[in-house]
Amino acid sequence: MAAGARAFESFPKGTRRPTAVLCMSDMVAIGVLGAANAAGLRVPEDLSVVGYDDLPMAAWTSPPLTTVRQPIVEKGRLAARLLIQRLQGKVVTSPAPLSTSLVVRGSTSRPSGSSRTQGEASEFVGEKEVS
């Protein structure tokens, strides 16, 4: 969560402030939620936040976190199976990507008071590496 708060602090301010943030994990997104709240921003009215993982706590944040659900248990089983095959000396091919789904909750909405219209390109502010 601290990584999300640190990333939030590096975002541009004022008119260049992003209207949405897609985080690498729910834990980072929860940190962004807290930092946005501390900065006086309203989520989702001023800033939309999306996490990744769909951890159980994502449904209990305020507001509830929109997130990308991944099949974590299936991912673990697949990793274990591939590891065992490699340890047995078998040739392992890359598996097909596992499916994900968007779980829309309360942390996302259209930008409020935005002059952007549907289909208009928005600016990519950049990636922030968190540690």
Q: For each predicted feature, which ranges?
A:
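Short beta->alpha junction loops
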Residues: 1-2
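Flexible loop/turn connectors
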Residues: 5-119, 123-126, 130
